[in-house]
Amino acid sequence: MKRVILHIDMDAFFAQVEQVKNPALRGKPIIVGGDAGHRGVVATCSYEARKYGIHSAMSSAEARRRCPHAIFVGGNLTNYVYISAQIQDIMNDYTPIVEPTSIDEAYLDITESYHLYGTPEKLAQDLKDNIKKRLQLTCTVGIAENKLLAKTASDMNKPDGLNTLWMNELEEKFFPMEIRKLRGVGPQTEKALKRLGINTLRDLKDYPEKKLSQNFGLHGEHLSKMAHGLSDTPVHSFEEMEDEKSMSHEHTLYEDTSDLIFLKSLMITLTDKVVARLKKAQFLAKTVRLKIRYSDFSTITREVTLNSMTDDVNTIYKTALTLLPVDDVVSNKVRLVGVGVTKLHEAVETPQIELFEESSISKKGKSGDVVEDIRDKFGKFSIVRASSLPYRWEH
Ligand SMILES: [Mg+2]
């Protein structure tokens, strides 16, 4: 059966919330986050400010240069989280399958419920009206048969938009798009694709998949599938994620970064912590999950299921590494990294090993591999004992 997925994206969320709270700010260029704290970057800005070329993650100094009369607002994360929860409540009135992907974005699977409203478009309009009526906030909704196209549809039509991207509209709306607009195509991939003469999604779709795979490995296959508008990732409801037995560790960076060495080292530390907990609880994991939050607060979670259950730090780290979207990480700075394991089962027998202690590295060849790999690639100072890393990085 054809699925119907919505992607809801609140328009300039933090700025809108501030404008609702203080009507004197309405219709004015508002910058949230800029002046507050040590970070000195724009968390988000109103559409009035965007007209001056200001965008999320820009330095406040640059934003002030572009629009000297912009109003800087410190922002109140607690309030945003509170309102985000209210939006989720409203979305839950339309379907139980709601997957929030950030504080102001979510996917909804309305396959089973849209007929109650007549059409998917009517359900989406009702949802938009409801959010507007109850919270005075506008959002943009994309409607399609899968998550990839729903997100693309909402990106096309901001703010206060409602846009469909059905399979029969791809010819007109999707295939003419430039390749860099496709999720997962960062500057590196874009350059490489252009070298092959691929400029639009149509070029990418028509390019032989075999040749793409030769150039990009597994990513090539994925790119080809996306260029055809295909994606079968299900919408995971929040409850479903909560119920699942899982263990994870996350770390919010002191400063956003695109430094791969740093991020990989951080992933080791996080894996180390996860594995320590796994072993302590005597569990084995079947699935490895990586979470990345970018400086604009957009968040991705990727996971892969292993062939067999494990509590081996080497296996879990290397698996997490295959999930790292290197292109995106380099082109968008990262704010938070999380490594986790799910699908846990009790282990029959788990030897207690302290990971990354000198003794275990020298005695246990396998644990040492990861360390040596990284040292080979990135130099001997790229990895030190896990427990000392946060100190080294954050001061
Ligand atoms: Mg938004």
Pin down the residues of each PLM region.
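Acidic, metal-coordinating catalytic segment for phosphate/diphosphate chemistry
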Residues: 308-395
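Gly/Gly-Pro- and Ser/Thr-rich, intrinsically disordered tail segments characteristic of DNA damage-repair
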Residues: 1-225, 238, 361-395
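Short, hydrophobic beta-strand segments
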Residues: 106-112, 301-304, 351-357
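A glycine-rich phosphate-binding loop feature that marks nucleotide/adenosyl-phosphate handling sites
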Residues: 145-148, 229, 284-294, 336-345, ...
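DNA-contacting surface of Y-family translesion DNA polymerases
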Residues: 7, 181, 191-333
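Active-site-proximal helix-loop elements at catalytic-domain edges
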Residues: 1-8, 100, 245, 340-350
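Short, charged/polar surface micro-motifs in flexible loops or helix N-caps
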Residues: 13, 36-39, 295-298, 344-347
